[in-house]
Amino acid sequence: SHYAEGPGKN
């Protein structure tokens, strides 16, 4: 759940 946009986004 950690992507470039931030944790919890995907």
UniProtKB/Swiss-Prot annotation:
Entry function: Component of the cytochrome c oxidase, the last enzyme in the mitochondrial electron transport chain which drives oxidative phosphorylation. The respiratory chain contains 3 multisubunit complexes succinate dehydrogenase (complex II, CII), ubiquinol-cytochrome c oxidoreductase (cytochrome b-c1 complex, complex III, CIII) and cytochrome c oxidase (complex IV, CIV), that cooperate to transfer electrons derived from NADH and succinate to molecular oxygen, creating an electrochemical gradient over the inner membrane that drives transmembrane transport and the ATP synthase.
Q: Where in the cell is it found?
A: Mitochondrion inner membrane
One GO cellular component term of this record is:
mitochondrial inner membrane
From which lineage does this chain's organism come? Answer: Eukaryota, Metazoa, Chordata, Craniata, Vertebrata
Looking at the record's lineage, which domain of life comes first? Eukaryota
Which pathway does it operate in?
Answer: Energy metabolism; oxidative phosphorylation
Keyword Mitochondrion in the entry? The reply is: yes
Please give the biological process terms from Gene Ontology that the record holds. oxidative phosphorylation
Q: How does it sit in the membrane?
A: Single-pass membrane protein
How does this protein assemble?
Component of the cytochrome c oxidase (complex IV, CIV), a multisubunit enzyme composed of 14 subunits. The complex is composed of a catalytic core of 3 subunits MT-CO1, MT-CO2 and MT-CO3, encoded in the mitochondrial DNA, and 11 supernumerary subunits COX4I, COX5A, COX5B, COX6A, COX6B, COX6C, COX7A, COX7B, COX7C, COX8 and NDUFA4, which are encoded in the nuclear genome.
- Entry keyword set: Membrane, Mitochondrion, Mitochondrion inner membrane, Oxidoreductase
Is Oxidoreductase given among the entry's keywords?
Answer: yes
Q: What is this protein called?
A: Cytochrome c oxidase polypeptide 7C, mitochondrial
Protein family membership: Belongs to the cytochrome c oxidase VIIc family.
Where it mainly occurs, coarsely classed, is mitochondrion
Molecular-function annotations in GO: oxidoreductase activity
